[in-house]
A protein has these predicted regions:
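Membrane-embedded alpha-helical bundles that constitute the cytochrome b-like, heme-associated redox core
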Residues: 1-208
Length: 208
């Protein structure tokens, strides 16, 4: 009981904290993370000798990711949230600080590009397997076109894996733990918020 009381005292009071991520944003983030991890496992493990019936898991999870991506894009367009992810040259020169730093915005854009590339090519690749959704037709594209599709899909997946590793690394280092807490609880203390602004203006890296 004493330990629980101490932990409660460590939590910032409501007046001493700011909302960084709404519940719907946190849910989207963790569902997307789960889909990406499953896709990584089902896509890579068979290539290192771990054999299992991965095809069904892979394409179903891929479709779940498509739903999440479409939801994210529609929500961004309807609520005009896309503007928050763009930056100008003036922002680079003056280190202006909004909700996200330039590094965080660049990470978001890079991950978005890789995920969209993997999603589009993955949807095309559904024509090569048997699913209840599409009639299998592996001859819809030429062998050369299929080769290009597979290369783009593989490179996008490898790039996404690299970005995930970088994202997790920067999320776990002590200076960035406030971002991890905010993605779990939704809140950031005002002290952490001030430290974040000071750190970004000083040129520190925040890639979570």
């Amino acid at each position: 009981m004493a330990v629980a009381a101490d932990r409660l005292q460590e939590l910032p009071a409501r007046s001493e904290r700011v909302l960084r991520h709404a519940g719907i944003d946190r849910l989207f983030h963790w569902l997307t993370a789960a889909c990406v991890l499953v896709l990584m496992a089902t896509g890579l493990l068979p290539h290192v000798g771990v054999q299992f019936d991965w095809t069904g898991i892979h394409w179903v999870t891929g479709l779940a990711l498509v739903v999440l991506v479409v939801f994210h894009l529609l929500r961004s367009l309807v609520w005009r949230r896309l503007r928050a992810m763009w930056f100008s040259l003036a922002e680079l020169r003056t280190h202006q600080v909004g909700k996200y730093s330039v590094a965080q915005k660049l990470m978001h854009h890079a991950m978005t590009l890789m995920v969209l590339s993997a999603v589009v090519t993955g949807l095309l690749m559904l024509k090569k397997i048997r699913t209840p959704l599409l009639l299998r037709d592996p001859y819809v594209f030429s062998a050369h076109t299929w080769g290009v599709i597979y290369v783009i899909h593989g490179l996008a997946a490898l790039a996404a894996i690299t970005l995930v590793i970088v994202h997790v690394y920067f999320g776990l280092i002590p200076d960035n733990r406030m971002y991890l807490r905010a993605m779990i609880t939704g809140w950031m203390s005002r002290g952490d918020q001030r430290a974040r602004v000071t750190g970004i203006r000083a040129g520190e890296k925040h890639l979570t």
